[in-house]
Swiss-Prot record:
GO biological process per UniProt: cell division; cell wall organization; peptidoglycan biosynthetic process; regulation of cell shape
GO cellular component, one term: cytoplasm
Binding site for UDP-N-acetyl-alpha-D-muramoyl-L-alanyl-D-glutamate: 27, 29, 44-46, 157-159, 185, 191, 193
Family in the record: Belongs to the MurCDEF family. MurE subfamily.
The name this protein goes by in its record: UDP-N-acetylmuramoyl-L-alanyl-D-glutamate--2,6-diaminopimelate ligase
UniProt-listed InterPro entries: Mur-like_cat_sf, Mur_ligase_C, Mur_ligase_C_dom_sf, Mur_ligase_cen, Mur_ligase_N, MurE/MurF_N, UDP-N-AcMur-Glu-dNH2Pim_ligase
EC number: 6.3.2.13
Broad EC category: ligase
Motif extent (Meso-diaminopimelate recognition motif): 414-417
Swiss-Prot/TrEMBL cofactor(s): Mg(2+)
PTMs per UniProt: Carboxylation is probably crucial for Mg(2+) binding and, consequently, for the gamma-phosphate positioning of ATP.
Positions bound to meso-2,6-diaminopimelate: 390, 414-417, 465, 469
Length: 495
């Protein structure tokens, strides 16, 4: 293939290279094999250049390495017959390099980016489902996994490495994908993992406290998210006008589509817009009446809570901006399915309603509790914990929110990792006014079981934090555990 040789791959940057055929591209020397291109980047934890001898021993055809402190930009050396090309700022160039290697897959499908603290997974899933109902072959990439709808393979990170992203997109194109919805994390933006992708549209859901252990403060976190619009090929911009940050961004994005549930739309100021006119919540979901610059309509949704209505409206606005007809979108809307582990409802006769959600930030927990309250005739229970070795500042905030919005709070473990579980729980309790009224149970399975067994049939039990996850990280061990499976077993239903 044309760009699978070293000379053609690096033609925009380096001349005089041999036309050496390349089989695969990898950042991991452990999996580098005969004929591969090994890329030696300098990361946060390791310097890939240390593994060049190992890659050569394993038979790689060529190497691209970070030039900093080693060589000049574009310098070519040879080690044991293997060409080594040094490029400066290799991490920043990696997405473009991988894009050339995999034949620019983002240009061969309609690819939509979704960024924001909360709502990324639901919005991407809705986009993929809806577009497929309209005839596309759709795929998702993100927290739940990567793949065509119905064939998603679990992943470790929301946004993989720059090479992984291009590789996965190329694989999806090869499988026939014509539409892709990708979650884009703040880490992925700062680390240039999606820098060379050509997005047909980019969606902003909201911004609230998360990842401050990485970004330091909210200003840097916002700046990371803004990179999607300021330094990337973002295509159509769709922005949540109900979010304070979103309203600020709309002032800098005059062609963006503004989306609102709360009346933050002025048709005279926003050329393209979509807003909820009325929302009625019921035990089956919600009835949404909306108006937009494309027309108006009504949607029956099986999704739970106000924030999921917002996610649905963002997906609708995105597809309208991409040219899908409103009439077709309205005809297919009722067939949209709830998303696994995202306000996912489990019910059985004579048992409490159990809702499993991924909410693991203060804002997400508040919204999940508010959503569950809309569907609760009895007591609202909240079972949650906070992750170990992560942002400690959010723990008391989440404790205060659970105490304020739930009737009964059960604090337990959620991936304690290398921290002492009781220390994490104490951090959560520190945010509560009356911690003595809180039920504390370190074992998560026991806590979930206890809550469901004690709740009455008109109660709602929100199990927050893990969502789709099927593991619990204790120490450095990844143990099998699923809130969904536990809840389903106790109710006698199938997860």
């Amino acid at each position: 293939m044309a760009d699978r040789n070293l000379r053609d791959l690096l033609a925009p940057w380096v001349a005089g290279l041999p036309a050496r055929e390349l089989r695969e591209m990898t950042l991991d020397s452990r999996v580098a094999a005969a004929g591969d291109l090994f890329v030696a980047v300098v990361g946060h934890q390791a310097d890939g250049r240390r593994y060049i001898p190992q890659a050569i021993a394993q038979g790689v055809a060529a190497i691209i390495a970070e030039a900093k402190d080693e060589a000049s930009d574009g310098e070519i050396r040879e080690m044991h017959g293997v060409p080594v090309v040094y490029l400066s700022q290799l991490n920043e160039r990696l997405s473009a390099l991988a894009g050339r290697f995999y034949h620019e897959p983002s240009e061969n499908m309609r690819l939509v980016a979704v960024t924001g603290t909360n709502g990324k997974t639901t919005t991407t899933q809705l986009l993929a489902q809806w577009s497929q109902l309209l005839g596309e072959t759709s795929a998702v990439m993100g927290t739940v996994g990567n793949g065509l709808l119905g064939k998603v393979i679990p992943t470790e990170n929301t946004t993989g490495s720059a090479v992984d992203v291009q590789h996965v997109l190329a694989s999806l194109v090869a499988q026939g994908a014509t539409f892709g919805a990708m979650e884009v994390s703040s880490h992925g933006l700062v680390q240039h993992r999606v820098a060379a992708l050509k997005f047909a549209a980019s969606v902003f859901t909201n911004l609230s406290r998360d990842h401050l252990d990485y970004h330091g403060d909210m200003a840097h976190y916002e700046a990371a998210k803004w990179m999607l619009y300021s330094t990337h090929h973002h295509g159509q911009a769709i922005v949540n006008a109900d979010d304070e940050v979103g309203r600020r961004w709309l002032a800098s994005l005059p062609d963006a589509v503004a989306v609102s549930m709360e009346g933050h739309i002025n048709p005279n100021c926003h050329g393209r817009w979509l807003k909820a006119e009325a929302v009625e919540y019921h035990d089956r979901g919600a009835t949404i009446r909306f108006a937009s610059s494309w027309g108006e309509g009504e949607i029956e949704s099986r999704l739970m809570g106000a924030f999921n209505v917002s996610n649905l409206l963002l997906a609708l606005a995105t597809l309208l901006a991409l040219g899908y007809p409103l009439t077709d979108l309205l005809k297919t809307a009722a067939r949209l399915q709830p998303v696994c582990g995202r306000m996912e409802v489990f019910t059985a006769p004579g048992k409490p309603t159990v809702v499993v959600d991924y909410a693991h930030t203060p804002d997400a927990l508040e919204k999940a509790l508010q959503a569950a309250r809309l569907h609760c005739a009895g007591k609202l229970w909240c079972v949650f914990g906070c992750g170990g070795d992560r942002d400690k500042g959010k723990r008391p905030l989440m404790g205060a929110i659970a105490e304020e919005f739930a009737d009964i709070v059960v604090v337990t473990d959620d991936n304690p990792r290398t921290e002492e579980p009781r220390a994490i729980i104490n951090d959560i309790l520190a945010g509560m006014l009356d911690a003595g009224q809180v039920r504390v149970m370190e074992g998560r399975a026991e806590a979930v079981t206890n809550a469901i067994m004690q709740a009455k049939d008109n109660d709602v039990v929100l199990i927050a934090g893990k969502g789709h996850e099927d593991y619990q990280i204790v120490g450095t061990q990844r143990l099998d555990y699923s809130d969904r499976v536990t809840a389903a077993r106790l109710l006698g239903v199938i997860a």
